[in-house]
């Protein structure tokens, strides 16, 4: 393994000839092409963890991606971010000991609730903003924020939300800009699709998209044709469709507009968004919008297909949904000058740690069951042009 800031990898990897002397492996949570995840109890403490077991033979030629992921995860200590607790190395395996989260995925919780309001959505987004603001202060850009990467810590009704999946994360360099076109198209910022250098502002755009979905249950951008989809995003063309947005506050819409601002220089930062009245004040409404939102989530995010199209890291319902190690061959997005997805394999090398740390990988809309946006009279609200 390479060095991080001059630090030898041997200094942060613990040697373990037999990992089972340290952990009792309870059950397999998931398997993939390159790794296995097990529910494990640390013998010395009795604590439960999700241990990701990666054969070294699967890492050959992919060391740099592993190092990038670990470099990111090792820096992060935040209550709303899934933590890397430890790293062990045996002669044949690398073991990543991750914080165990068992509360399930965001969409599942919303659908299962009988009551859901703007205030609930505001509370969720506030936690995301706090976590992403922390990342940005650390010089880390997530680059792939989406609902599927938001997990509940526990089954408790008041459980906090957790951000997972740092397979596309990047440490900002001195120039504070990046240029690799990657992420999930439905959530990616216009400047990324335009192949322009970009910064942490891309995460703020994604938070705006997430907020949009949390309030209506469907994505702001949709088209059967990928080029047209990308054109919508490039122009920041989205609407607050009636009747789905009729009962949503103007404050919520203003919050979204400021995050889904085409110009990254005008776009809200996490700090600015956290001060918006919809987050920091009392403008988020308490009206129950569960019926409409949950119906749209069921319609637009069908599990059987949707989950195949995203990187996700989750221990859900009996801690059995986590699957790791799916190949990225079908998921690495590269946006060409004509906004085609024809070269999906070219964006990120298959060595990207999503291959090892996340579940079925892919790109929104590619291989997923696409469903049309509601065909109704629109309110006339659009994003900045």
Curated annotation (Swiss-Prot):
Induction data: Down-regulated upon cholesterol-rich diet.
Tissues where this protein is expressed: Expressed ubiquitously with high levels in brain and low levels in kidney. Isoform 2 is highly expressed in brain compared to other tissues. In hematopoietic cell lines predominant expression was detected in T and EC cells.
An example Gene Ontology biological process: positive regulation of CREB transcription factor activity
GO molecular function, one term: calcium/calmodulin-dependent protein kinase activity
Description of how activity is regulated: Activated by Ca(2+)/calmodulin. Binding of calmodulin results in conformational change that relieves intrasteric autoinhibition and allows phosphorylation of Thr-180 within the activation loop by CaMKK1 or CaMKK2. Phosphorylation of Thr-180 results in several fold increase in total activity. Unlike CaMK4, may be unable to exhibit autonomous activity after Ca(2+)/calmodulin activation.
EC number of the protein: 2.7.11.17
Subcellular locations according to the entry: Cytoplasm; Nucleus
Location of region: Calmodulin-binding: 299-320
Record's GO cellular component terms: cytoplasm; nucleus
Catalytic reaction list: L-seryl-[protein] + ATP = O-phospho-L-seryl-[protein] + ADP + H(+); L-threonyl-[protein] + ATP = O-phospho-L-threonyl-[protein] + ADP + H(+)
First-level EC class: transferase
Highest rank taxon of the organism: Eukaryota
Modified residues (Phosphothreonine): 180
Keywords associated with the record: Allosteric enzyme, ATP-binding, Calcium, Calmodulin-binding, Cytoplasm, Inflammatory response, Isopeptide bond, Kinase, Neurogenesis, Nucleotide-binding, Nucleus, Phosphoprotein, Serine/threonine-protein kinase, Transferase, Ubl conjugation
Motif (Nuclear export signal) on chain: 318-324
Covalent link Glycyl lysine isopeptide (Lys-Gly) (interchain with G-Cter in SUMO2), residues: 113
Location of the region described as Disordered in the Swiss-Prot/TrEMBL record: 363-385
Polar residues bias: start-end ranges: 375-385
Family in the record: Belongs to the protein kinase superfamily. CAMK Ser/Thr protein kinase family. CaMK subfamily.
Function: Calcium/calmodulin-dependent protein kinase that operates in the calcium-triggered CaMKK-CaMK1 signaling cascade and, upon calcium influx, activates CREB-dependent gene transcription, regulates calcium-mediated granulocyte function and respiratory burst and promotes basal dendritic growth of hippocampal neurons. In neutrophil cells, required for cytokine-induced proliferative responses and activation of the respiratory burst. Activates the transcription factor CREB1 in hippocampal neuron nuclei. May play a role in apoptosis of erythroleukemia cells.
Domain free text: The autoinhibitory domain overlaps with the calmodulin binding region and interacts in the inactive folded state with the catalytic domain as a pseudosubstrate.
Protein known as: Calcium/calmodulin-dependent protein kinase type 1D
